Curated annotation (Swiss-Prot):
[2Fe-2S] cluster binds at C75, C80, C83, C117. The N-terminus (targeting peptide) is probably responsible for targeting to the encapsulin nanocompartment. InterPro entries: 2Fe-2S_ferredoxin-like_sf, 2Fe-2S_ferredoxin-type, 2Fe2S_fd_BS, Beta-grasp_dom_sf. This is Ferredoxin. Its main location: other. One of its GO terms (cellular component) is encapsulin nanocompartment. It comes from Bacillus thermotolerans.
Length: 122
């Protein structure tokens, strides 16, 4: 008859607690349910409506649409101006206006207007 139990000095002592195997906790990191910090939001207005775009690296129009925002647009090339938005918060997190924006928006850039199809979040 074979025994799987090993005898040790400690196991031979009476009234000694027996070691218990503790299962390891899984090392899966749960995503945080906390709201995004304010600095991670770009706030803008278009045609009298206000929108908040979560800041991720990429094009402002493309990311806004992928986040379910009903932003108006047409050409995506910066020529029609339909995607013009006024950035009310977070402008410093956007790329500098490019030549196409300067041409289409002229002096309105100083008032916070951008072409969403040309502005990139950095």
């Amino acid at each position: 008859m074979s025994h799987d139990r090993r005898l040790t000095v400690g196991s031979l002592l009476p009234n000694q607690p027996r070691p218990v195997a503790v299962p390891k906790a899984p090392s899966v990191v749960q995503p945080s349910k906390q709201p995004l910090p304010e600095k991670a939001i770009i706030r803008l207005e278009q045609n009298g409506r206000s929108f908040s775009v979560r800041h991720v690296k990429g094009n402002l129009l493309t990311e806004g649409l992928s986040q379910g925002l009903p932003l108006q647009y047409k050409c995506r090339k910066g020529t029609c101006g339909v995607c013009t938005v006024k950035v009310t918060d977070g402008a410093s997190r956007l790329s500098l206006p490019n030549q196409q924006e300067h041409k289409k928006l002229q002096g309105n850039i100083k008032s916070g207007f951008r072409l969403a199809c040309q502005a990139n979040m950095e």
